[in-house]
């Protein structure tokens, strides 16, 4: 286990100093901590073409019950929340127009796989939240299928290539295309919500306020930076005022796992995966129910619950249950697929390269699981992993996952710098990729040479605080970090603490839990905890006197009004303490 302190050695004002190390100015810091008002929100007028979008929306508000507005629902949580915000907002202004949500059958985006479905609705307008900026050819073709032509409203946040053409039939509002809009970390739901704020400003209303919780859910689920002051305001305000009935139902279902707290981390770990599982593994009927739950959660639907035939349930409650089932189903399928891929790895000696690259051929499983498979295999084999399929054009497309605890801090940057990939889209250690099959061998040669001295089996941590167990300020450090638990998220990760010289005997090791696999060690008033720790128990049992080193995260345990400072252990190193004296 290797650790590197990535900021200055902070010995006071722990959270404040860390946030300034991460780029906040003193003025920004105070706002970030307190969120006293909405001054961090940018004026939506800074989004290019928003006035034209408002004019198009004005026409939508006048559509009759003989007209249709098609809304394409992108296939991720940001897509669902973006479309849900738009539809509910439009309903504030027009209760009669026929609004048709169109869901992707797979993990598609924009018009690429929804073209025929949209055409069949004979729409007057097509709205594409969280996608569509790159759909020039589809828009041009579809617009002219009708006379008069149909028009498109695109509310997006994705990066657009410099040579992209834009159709005269579309109004595109995109923060990436708006030089005056400074927050490039706003997601599709955020852009959609800002559009609603703009229209409110024209009409003297505040309907958009009702949907800030969905904008917050989209921001967290799409892994946008939580260091952005605007994102901080939206997420802080949205999670404090959850109004969407389905979002509430999901939080109630996951309340135990979330510890009753709605924060960027608890939502990312316990809410987003449920919705993603439904999008990936649910039937079309179940996915449609899930989206309906977002826009009309109190609607009664026939219960699909075993033993409840002939009864009705609110769709938000029904879909929350189905999302949980979809997660379990997805995990079962995933386990089976990973087993099959492990056979392929062994058969073709794929571990001979520094990058585990699995080119799929005949494997029959949904491409929506590529990323999850890559994540599981990367964790098991402790190396960056790509799971991808070869298409008819000779290009391999799929998903990559790097290791967060390794010397290779950005697998995405590594692939970009190699020059072999046609695209990498996503985050440092989780992104979609494309590479021509003819370049695969050359990439392996490049990677094997560049990474020859990198030991992916040895965990490597970028830590924010380093201490020895006897340091007097560890308790204060834990309290300070834990009381700011709603700050941490993507781009502003929960601080890692590295503690050395925890000198104990085997009698200091407490074994807890129903499965007797939870470790608790108390030293100098700090409880060091690790769950599912059978391997750690074996390692600790080797010695009578133990020198322990840990990397972990701060936690405050509350019981009957009493608080215990804890470190939740991420990783550890055990040495024979008898040799240390």
Where are these regions (language model features)?
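Hydrophobic helix-and-loop "lid/oligomerization" segment in the mid-to-C-terminal part
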Residues: 2-125, 143-150, 200-448, 467-469
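Short beta-strand/turn micro-motifs composed of small residues
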Residues: 73, 130, 156, 389, ...
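Conserved phosphate-handling catalytic cores of large alpha/beta enzymes
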Residues: 116-119, 126-145, 151-215, 224
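Active-site proximal loops enriched in glycine and acidic residues that flank catalytic Cys/His/Asp
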Residues: 130-131, 359-362, 389-390, 400-402, ...
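Nucleic-acid-binding small beta-barrel platforms of the OB/S1 family
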Residues: 192-194, 405-408, 574-581
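A contiguous loop/helix-start segment that scaffolds small-molecule binding in enzyme catalytic cores
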Residues: 239-240, 244-248, 449-538
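OB-fold single-stranded nucleic acid-binding module
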Residues: 431, 439-443, 470, 546-581
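Short nucleic-acid-contacting surface segments enriched for D/E, G, S/T with interspersed K/R
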Residues: 535-551
């Amino acid at each position: 286990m290797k650790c590197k302190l990535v900021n200055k050695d902070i010995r006071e004002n722990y959270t404040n100093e860390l946030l300034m190390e991460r780029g906040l100015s003193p003025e920004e810091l105070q706002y970030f901590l307190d969120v006293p008002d909405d001054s961090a929100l940018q004026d939506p007028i800074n989004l290019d073409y928003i006035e034209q979008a408002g004019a198009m929306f004005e026409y939508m508000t006048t559509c009759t019950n003989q007209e249709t507005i098609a809304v394409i629902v992108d296939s991720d949580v940001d897509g669902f929340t973006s479309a849900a915000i738009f539809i509910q907002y439009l309903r504030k202004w027009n209760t009669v127009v026929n609004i048709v949500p169109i869901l992707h059958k797979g993990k598609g985006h924009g018009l690429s796989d929804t073209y025929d479905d949209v055409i069949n609705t004979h729409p007057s307008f097509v709205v594409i939240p969280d996608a569509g900026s790159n759909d020039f050819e589809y828009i041009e073709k579809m617009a002219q299928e009708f006379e008069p032509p149909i028009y498109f409203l695109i509310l997006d946040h994705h990066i657009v290539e410099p040579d992209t053409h834009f159709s005269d039939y579309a109004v595109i509002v995109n923060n990436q295309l708006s030089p005056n809009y400074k927050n490039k970390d706003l997601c599709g739901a955020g852009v959609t919500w800002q559009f609603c704020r703009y229209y409110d400003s024209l009409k003297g209303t505040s309907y958009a306020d009702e949907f800030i919780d969905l904008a917050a859910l989209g921001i967290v689920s799409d892994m946008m930076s939580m260091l952005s002051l605007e994102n901080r305001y939206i997420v802080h305000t949205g999670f404090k005022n959850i109004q969407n009935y389905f979002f509430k139902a999901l939080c109630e279902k996951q309340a135990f796992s979330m510890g009753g707290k709605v924060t960027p981390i608890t939502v990312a770990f316990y809410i987003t995966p449920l919705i993603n599982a439904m999008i990936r593994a649910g039937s079309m009927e179940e996915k449609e129910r899930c989206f309906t739950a977002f826009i009309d959660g109190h609607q009664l639907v026939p219960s699909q619950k075993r033993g409840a035939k002939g009864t009705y349930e609110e769709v938000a409650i029904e879909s929350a249950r189905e999302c949980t089932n979809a997660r379990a189903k997805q995990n079962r399928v995933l386990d089976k697929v990973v087993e099959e891929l492990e056979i392929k790895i062994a058969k073709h000696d794929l571990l001979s390269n520094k990058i585990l690259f699995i080119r799929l051929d005949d494997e029959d499983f949904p491409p929506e699981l590529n990323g999850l498979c890559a994540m599981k295999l990367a964790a098991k084999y402790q190396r960056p992993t790509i799971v991808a399929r070869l298409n008819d054009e000779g290009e391999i497309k799929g998903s990559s996952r790097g290791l967060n605890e390794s010397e290779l801090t950005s697998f995405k940057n590594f692939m970009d710098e190699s020059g072999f990939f046609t695209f990498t889209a996503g985050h440092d250690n989780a992104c979609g990729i494309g590479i021509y099959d003819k370049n695969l061998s050359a990439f392996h040669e490049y990677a094997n040479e560049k990474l020859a001295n990198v030991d992916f089996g040895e965990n490597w941590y970028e830590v924010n605080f380093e201490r020895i167990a006897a340091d007097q300020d560890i308790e204060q450090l834990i309290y300070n970090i834990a009381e700011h638990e709603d700050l941490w998220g993507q781009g502003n990760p929960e601080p890692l603490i590295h503690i050395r010289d925890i000198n104990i005997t085997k009698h200091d090791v407490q074994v807890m839990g129903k499965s007797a696999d939870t470790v608790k060690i108390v030293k100098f008033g700090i409880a060091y905890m690790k769950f599912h720790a059978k391997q750690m128990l074996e390692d600790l049992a080797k010695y009578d006197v133990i020198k322990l080193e840990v990397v972990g995260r701060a936690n405050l345990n509350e019981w009957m009004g009493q608080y215990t400072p804890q470190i939740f252990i991420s990783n550890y190193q055990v040495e024979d303490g008898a040799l240390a004296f």
